[in-house]
Structure formats: structure tokens, C-alpha cells
A protein has these predicted regions:
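C-terminal substrate-binding/active-site "lid" region of AdoMet-derived donor-dependent transferases
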Residues: 2-6, 188-258, 266
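N-terminal auxiliary segments of SAM/dcSAM-dependent transferases
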Residues: 1-74
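Conserved SAM-binding loop and adjacent beta-strand
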Residues: 10-13, 83-97
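S-adenosyl-L-methionine
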Residues: 138-187
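Short beta-strand element of Class I
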Residues: 132-136
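Helix-to-beta-strand junctions that scaffold the AdoMet/dcAdoMet cofactor pocket
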Residues: 129-130, 157, 198-202
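Conserved SAM-binding loop of SAM-dependent methyltransferases across substrates and taxa
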Residues: 118-131
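Conserved class I S-adenosyl-L-methionine
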Residues: 106-117
């Protein structure tokens, strides 16, 4: 390995000034801080000097002035989402992760969301699209937008997001975006606006708390030439990581909302199937098992 490659590996392995670090106590108490020369973190276990963290390897320990240690780790997206300051209920990481996968959101994606809230989903979107993608986030409550901007600025992700304060009934400024996600109760009222901003074949997604709302959205999706629609919920169960007595934890994150995904189609190309016709077609599709190459 040449000298330059060695320097790159070494740089990635150690804590640098300006990076986010997560300090974890032996009892799994977390602190996420941005490492600054001369900075200090005051905890009930003592003071942690940032200078004692700078240059240390990720995964090592740092000690407070009282001799208590913390592990030094890079925070993942899940930890960052749990640190989001909130005034309202935020989407759970289990739902957010599924949204990213189902809507094809990754490096370079241009995505629009409505219903910024505290910015949990916005954080994940900005994280996923990278420096070459962009997020347009609409919110009609000034106090919520202010909180979201603060949350993303703290994480260094605000430059990937354009925040807009507007009632989405007025429509969106953008066109040809790759994906649109609506976190609003009456998403079914805004599909005309969604069609105008979403590219043909693009991804649409929404989250809703009740089946009645989902039913209204399904009707509106069909009327507005969306197809290949999925409705689902994400159920997550953790297990206690103890080899001798492996079993589920006492608390389970079950139903948190209904997720709806669909694709924008050109007019006159979306399937025209009634409920009974859809069931019949689905049964036929299940019978048509493709032959595997020998």
C-alpha cells in the first residue's frame, strides 16, 4: 500500500475535528456530540474533554475526569434519528428504512416530502441522497420548520435540503423529481399536485394512521393514474442478545402506521381493474410460475 492510501485508511479510523461522535457508557447511555478542539462534555459521570477524543481510534475508550469511561463510536442513522428533538410524533426508524428501500432513494436521488414535522424523515432522506442528491421539504407550520432546520443543521445535513413554508394545496415548485412522500393526513387530496411534480414512473409514498384514510388514498391513486400500489405495515421485534436465554425483549414496536407505495403512470396506461378483477388477476399471476434455467 502506498503512503497516500495508508493516510486515507488512518484518517478514516480516527476521530477528526468537526466529526460527530457517539459516546456510549457501559450501561448504554448515549451522547452524540460534534468534536471541537477545546470542547467539553459535562455528564453526571464527569467531564469529557474533546481533546482527549481527537485522534483516538473509533471503538476505543475515553475517560472523564472522574475516571469513568465511555466508548467512542460513529453514530449510525438510527442513533441520529433517536436524537431528533421533537414537538410531534415522528416516524419510527423501522418505517423510515423501509421507505428508503421501497422508493429507491439513494445517492443522487431528488426527492420531495410534504409534512416536514420535526425532520426525522428529512434527516434520513438527506443522509441517503448524499451530496449529489437533494431534498425539497414542505411544511405549513413555521415552528415545526424552524425545529427541523435546527435538527438538520446540528447534524450537518441542512445544505442537502431546501425547506419551504407553504400549504401544499398551492402546489409544488419542482418538476421531474424522482420520488414524493406525503406525511399528511389527507394525502388523497393532493395527488394532482404530486403528478405535476413527479417524473413519469416515479415513486410515490405516504404514511397514514387509519384504514379509512388508506381506502380514500387508494381510490384517489387509481383516479390519478397511479399503479403497482402496495399497502403494508412494518412489525419489528427485538431479541435479548443473551446466548443462554435468547428470547424476545419485553417491549415490541408493532403497528405505527400504514405505508402506501405506488408508481406514477402515463394516462391510459394504468391498469383498470375492479377489486374482484384484481383478486382474480392476482390468483392467475400466482399460478404462472416462471421456469428456471437448467
Amino acid at each position: 500500500m502506498d503512503q497516500n492510501s495508508s493516510d486515507i485508511v488512518q484518517t478514516k479510523d480516527v476521530v477528526l475535528a468537526g466529526e460527530l461522535a457517539m459516546l456510549v457508557s457501559p450501561t448504554n447511555k448515549n451522547f452524540i456530540i460534534r468534536i471541537l478542539p477545546g470542547g467539553e462534555l459535562h455528564t453526571h459521570r464527569g467531564i469529557v474533554r474533546h481533546d482527549d477524543i481527537l485522534g483516538q481510534f473509533w471503538g476505543s475508550k475515553v475517560f472523564t475526569h472522574k475516571g469513568v469511561f465511555y466508548y467512542i463510536l460513529q453514530p449510525g442513522l438510527g442513533e441520529l434519528l433517536r436524537e431528533t428533538a421533537r414537538n410531534t410524533q415522528i416516524m419510527y426508524p423501522k418505517d423510515i428504512g423501509f421507505v428508503l428501500v421501497m422508493m429507491g432513494i439513494g445517492a443522487g436521488t431528488v426527492v420531495l416530502e410534504a409534512g416536514t414535522g420535526s425532520g426525522a424523515l428529512t434527516t434520513a432522506l438527506a443522509w441517503a441522497v448524499g451530496s449529489n442528491g437533494h431534498v425539497f421539504s414542505y411544511e405549513n407550520r413555521p415552528e415545526m420548520q424552524k425545529l427541523a432546520v435546527k435538527n438538520l443543521s446540528k447534524l450537518g445535513l441542512a445544505d442537502r435540503v431546501t425547506f419551504k413554508l407553504r400549504d401544499i394545496q398551492e402546489g409544488f415548485d419542482e418538476s421531474g423529481v424522482d420520488a414524493v412522500f406525503l406525511d399528511v393526513q389527507n394525502a388523497y387530496d393532493f395527488l394532482t399536485q404530486v403528478r405535476q411534480t413527479l417524473k413519469s414512473g416515479g415513486f410515490f409514498g405516504s404514511i397514514m394512521p387509519t384504514t379509512n384514510q388508506v381506502q380514500r388514498l387508494l381510490i384517489s391513486l387509481h383516479q390519478n393514474h397511479f399503479a403497482f400500489t402496495d399497502v403494508c405495515e412494518v412489525i419489528l421485534r427485538y431479541y435479548k442478545p443473551v446466548p443462554e436465554r435468547l428470547r424476545p425483549t419485553d417491549r415490541m414496536v408493532a403497528h405505527t402506521g400504514y405505508l402506501i407505495f405506488s408508481r406514477k403512470m402515463l394516462p391510459n396506461t394504468s391498469p383498470e381493474l375492479s377489486g374482484d378483477q384484481f383478486d382474480a388477476q392476482e390468483k392467475q399471476d400466482n399460478l404462472e410460475v416462471p421456469e428456471l434455467d437448467s
